[in-house]
Curated annotation (Swiss-Prot):
SUPFAM superfamilies: ClpP/crotonase. It catalyses: Hydrolysis of proteins to small peptides in the presence of ATP and magnesium. alpha-casein is the usual test substrate. In the absence of ATP, only oligopeptides shorter than five residues are hydrolyzed (such as succinyl-Leu-Tyr-|-NHMec, and Leu-Tyr-Leu-|-Tyr-Trp, in which cleavage of the -Tyr-|-Leu- and -Tyr-|-Trp bonds also occurs). Its main location: cytoplasm. It comes from Salmonella typhimurium (strain LT2 / SGSC1412 / ATCC 700720). This is ATP-dependent Clp protease proteolytic subunit.
Length: 207
């Protein structure tokens, strides 16, 4: 997780997105695959967590809540992490909206990706069998006058403390345990993530 106000140069998304054609009473309609899955209340959080991606995910959640506030939303996560403020906008929206947000880790959920994974609705947080989860403390970098560096250092420590409190709340671990375990990168397999309380169970097949 990066606290720095600077944004990384992000790799462009794939230029070609598969299209799905549906037959309706009015003829054929075509959707890009993500729009079609959004109709099924599926949202993808993939790649670096940054402002543009976070805004899109927040907008999709609010749209799905407006469509049906009673039905679950399914958030699929495959992310190495990213900018804390962007991730926290997604986190706060997940907690704010009425529908439960079920989180599913596919591939990896590292750093802010892991934080959002464990923020899903209790009992509805999942890993696929070979996915990996990594937790650690926030990363930060700032250049400037000594006084400004001191201000930013105090701020990142506040952010670290708040994120540890939230992680403890969602996992059931003690705050002291979270502080110890996030001092350095800690990688967990799917079974270890279940044992730690980051997720509730492992999905092997659809019901």
């Amino acid at each position: 997780m990066s606290y720095s106000g600077e944004r990384d140069n992000l790799a462009p998304h794939m230029a070609l997105v598969p299209m799905v054609i549906e037959q309706t009473s009015r003829g054929e309609r075509s959707f890009d695959i993500y729009s079609r899955l959004l109709k099924e209340r599926v949202i993808f959080l993939t790649g670096q967590v940054e402002d543009h991606m976070a805004n899109l995910i927040v907008a999709q959640m609010l749209f799905l809540e407006a469509e049906n506030p009673e039905k679950d939303i399914y958030l699929y996560i495959n992310s190495p992490g990213g900018v804390i403020t962007a991730g926290m906008s997604i986190y706060d929206t997940m907690q704010f909206i009425k529908p439960d947000v079920s989180t599913i880790c596919m591939g990896q959920a590292a750093s802010m990706g892991a934080f959002l994974l464990t923020a899903g609705a209790k009992g509805k947080r999942f890993c696929l069998p070979n996915s990996r989860v990594m937790i650690h403390q926030p990363l930060g970098g700032y250049q400037g006058q000594a006084t400004d560096i001191e201000i930013h250092a105090r701020e990142i420590l506040k952010v670290k403390g708040r994120m540890n409190e939230l992680m403890a709340h969602h996992t059931g671990q003690s705050l002291e345990q979270i502080e110890r375990d996030t001092e350095r990168d800690r990688f967990l397999s799917a079974p270890e993530a279940v044992e730690y309380g980051l997720v509730d169970s492992i999905l092997t097949h659809r019901n």
